[in-house]
Amino acid sequence: STTDQRAAFLEEVATQIDARGAEITAIGIKETGLPEARLEGERGRTVAQLRMFADHIKIDAHLDHRHDKALPERVPAPRPDLQLFQRPIGPVAVFGASNFPLAFSSAGGDTAAALAAGCPVVVKGHPAHPGIADFIAQAFDAAIKATGVHAGVFNQVNDGGHVVGEALVKHPLIRAVGFTGSLRAGRILFDIAAARPDPIPFFGELGSINPMFVLPAAAASRGMEIASGWAGSLTMGAGQFCTNPGIAVMLDGPAKEQFAKTATQALTQVVPQTMLTGGIAKAFQDGCTAMFNELGVEALIASDNTGREAGPQLFTTTASNWLTRPALQVEVFGPLGILVIAKDMDEMRAVAQALHGQLTCTLHLDGGDIDDAKTIVPILERKAGRLLANGFPTGVEVCDSMVHSGPYPASTNFGATSVGTMAIRRFLRPVCYQNIPNDFLP
């Protein structure tokens, strides 16, 4: 297909999804328990993402064209004409996510990026929202008919369990995989992709605790404000965001006491929320139980959790204890936070240094924190795909500059991103054309 054909197809898919907006929202409320406003907002993000990639390829931004012209008179040896273009890698398998039934599922970022690159897509729909996936498939079918693109450009299988997922990754025609989900499931599929006779890239977005570092001056001047914001970010969507800020790190002292009190008060006001699936709720309950059983960890808030309902949980521990307990770095998917108390900046830097790979790391700082921040930012740059100052990570902007990945276990490929226009690069590979006539160039 040509770039113009692909762009028109992506735009038509967006139009067809919008045309089914009411039905998608209605079935989504029943399947996921998510509120209407959340589903409407996520649908807007999804169609905007499709149109963003259409605009991106219309100007050939994805081709990364580079041209070193021939130098036939160069001595001691002439240079041939050399041109580089990015080319599609082939069929891509995409796994729908449980927590974003639209933006990270059948028509989500992985699918949009792969189609924009020129790669056919096979989606494995998530069992948590088959009705939404069905409407999205209808939108794709209508867009295929309206634009005349090849009928095989989009295919979807709904559920089928682990057997279907593993078979998809093993299929010899699949050239790459996009995945958003748990560390356990993602690592199994990653290993399968690597064990193939012809290993393929597995772009997995897996687990992250997204730490916040509250530096001393900021803690003293606006600790209550930061604590309230943390509580809101921690419980947004029942904590079911991959960018949920699971730990806050700060120094011991009066500011810490006020921070803990404010966060506790704010979280106490949050009513239990319905989690997306029974499996996610059970995993959250197990994570809370494990946290209660960790030595040196004190519960500040311990909500009762029954069925699919999840109330906020808040724990605290010392940095010295956190540093000796690897289990405290394991993501608990849900509204659970840990306040980690360091005795001094050296210990705070030790926490930063000990972090596994993260999607995000956040600094809360004021003017008096600049010198301390300069010693911690170089550490965090090596730990995360996105660094924030004086904000909260649960909003992920879809734009050219966004990076949504990080070192393992945040993702399986720290040089890529699953959000933003650079996400298309996962499904392209560079090809150099030497002295090839223009008739054969992309």
Predicted regions and their residues:
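N-terminal Rossmann-like NAD(P)+-binding subdomain of aldehyde/semialdehyde dehydrogenases
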Residues: 1-80
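Short loop-to-beta-strand entry elements in the cores of soluble alpha/beta enzymes
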Residues: 9, 117-132, 153, 198-216, ...
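Rossmann-like NAD(P) dinucleotide-binding subdomain of oxidoreductase/dehydrogenase enzymes
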Residues: 61-231, 253-256
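Short, glycine-/Ser/Thr-/acidic-enriched flexible segments
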Residues: 99, 128, 161-163, 174, ...
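Short, surface-exposed amphipathic charged segments that create phosphate/polyanion-binding patches used
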Residues: 168-173, 216-222, 288-289, 312-313, ...
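NAD(P)-dependent aldehyde/semialdehyde dehydrogenase
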Residues: 228, 250-359, 371
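C-terminal core of ALDH-fold dehydrogenases
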Residues: 307-310, 345-441
